[in-house]
C-alpha cells in the first residue's frame, strides 16, 4: 500500500507539515497543491528520501513549477493542480477542473486554492481538496493499493 500526505496552501506555515511528516509512518510520497512552492521546496530539502510532487499556485508567480502535473503512485494516476487556472472558486460544479483532469483519466484529482476541504466522487475518480494548512488547518492522506484510492481529510 502506498501512503501519500497531501498539503496545500501552506502560505509559509510549514511547522505543522513537519510535525505530521515526522509522526506519520510509511510515507510513500508527499503532494503539495500550491501556495507556496517555496514551502514544498523546503520540505523536499528536509525530507530528501520522500518523493515530493508540487505545482504552483496563484501566489507562486515567480515559481518555475508547472501549473499541473500527472503522476503515477501505487498504480493510480493522480492529476494535481492548484485550481486557480480552473476557476475552482467560481464554478460550483468544478467544470473546468473536470474537463482538464478528464484528459488523463485520473483515479485521483487534487486541487487547492479555496482553503476549504472538499471530497467528491466523480466516475472512477476522487476529487480532493485537502483544505489549507494555514487557514482551515487541514490536510489529507491518500492510501493507494492496486490502483484503488481511499482518502481522508484530517485536522491539524
What are these regions (language model features)?
Residues 77-114:
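Internal catalytic-core helix/loop-beta-alpha segment
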Residues 11-15, 37-41, 59-64, 86-90, ...:
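Active-site environment of divalent metal-dependent phosphoester hydrolases
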Residues 51-89:
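Helix-adjacent hinge/juxtasegments
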Residues 1-49, 60, 66-67, 144-149:
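N-terminal active-site segment of His-dependent metallophosphoesterases
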Residues 48-51, 125:
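A short helix->loop->beta-strand "cap" motif at the edges of active sites that frequently abuts
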Residues 2, 67, 73-74, 96, ...:
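Binuclear metal-dependent phosphoesterase catalytic core
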Residues 6-8, 29-35, 53-58, 80-82, ...:
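Active-site neighborhood of phospho(di)ester-bond hydrolases with catalytic His/Asp-centered motifs
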Amino acid at each position: 500500500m502506498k501512503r501519500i500526505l497531501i498539503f496545500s496552501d501552506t502560505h509559509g506555515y510549514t511547522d505543522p507539515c513537519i510535525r505530521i511528516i515526522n509522526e506519520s509512518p510509511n510515507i510513500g510520497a508527499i503532494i503539495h497543491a500550491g501556495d507556496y512552492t517555496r514551502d514544498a521546496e523546503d520540505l523536499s530539502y528536509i525530507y530528501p528520501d520522500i518523493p515530493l510532487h508540487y505545482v504552483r499556485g496563484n501566489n507562486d508567480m515567480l515559481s518555475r513549477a508547472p501549473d499541473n502535473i500527472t503522476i503515477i503512485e501505487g498504480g493510480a494516476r493522480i492529476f494535481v493542480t492548484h485550481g486557480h487556472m480552473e476557476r475552482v472558486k467560481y464554478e460550483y460544479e468544478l467544470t473546468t477542473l473536470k474537463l482538464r483532469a478528464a484528459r488523463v483519466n485520473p483515479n485521483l484529482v487534487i486541487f487547492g486554492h479555496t482553503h476549504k476541504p472538499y471530497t467528491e466522487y466523480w466516475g472512477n475518480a476522487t476529487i480532493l481538496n485537502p483544505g489549507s494548512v494555514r487557514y482551515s488547518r487541514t490536510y489529507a492522506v491518500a492510501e493507494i493499493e492496486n490502483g484503488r484510492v481511499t482518502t481522508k481529510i484530517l485536522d491539524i
